[in-house]
Amino acid sequence: SEPDMTKPLGCSSLRRTLQLKELYPEMEVKSIRGNLQTRLRKLDNGEYSGLILAAAGLKRLGLEKRICRYFSEDEILPAAGQGILAVQARAGEYQELLEVLNDPRSEAAAKAERAFVKVLNGGCTSPVAAYAEIRGSKCYITGLYWRESDENWFVEKTSGNKKEAELLGETLAHNMQKKYGK
């Protein structure tokens, strides 16, 4: 359903906010703080026309009936590694047991995304984003680069052999830095 255009969209992520302004240029996107219940209460009280939240968090809390729309990766590029689960163990312990849980495609995608973000010094609060997908023997990666100097952002894509996923992420980030500056 479409949002009420007279009230702002609530969002706590600069990365999502940048992309929302392109999706809904006629709408105000306003920062929202507080835990999930506080944010939902503000929505229910009419302060916002909608909230942009991670669906996984709502599902985990049994609140998926509150979800009215999902965004595709083409609409809102996710943070690197979003949706990928990791299992860690101390060195030398349980590696063989845990190896059966590893999905090589997810691992390659995660390496590409993390490499992109690392080159750009992106962190949890930085609006840098990357999404990689493995199809067959190829890795397809899309990156969002935010230029701090003027707060413009750019999205580019590349692809290559999945065995070089990490290098693909690094190369995309370096190319975007060269092309768009800092």
Name each region found by the language model.
Residues 1-27:
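A conserved helix-loop-strand patch within extracytoplasmic ligand-binding domains
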Residues 17, 22-182:
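Small-molecule-sensing regulatory modules
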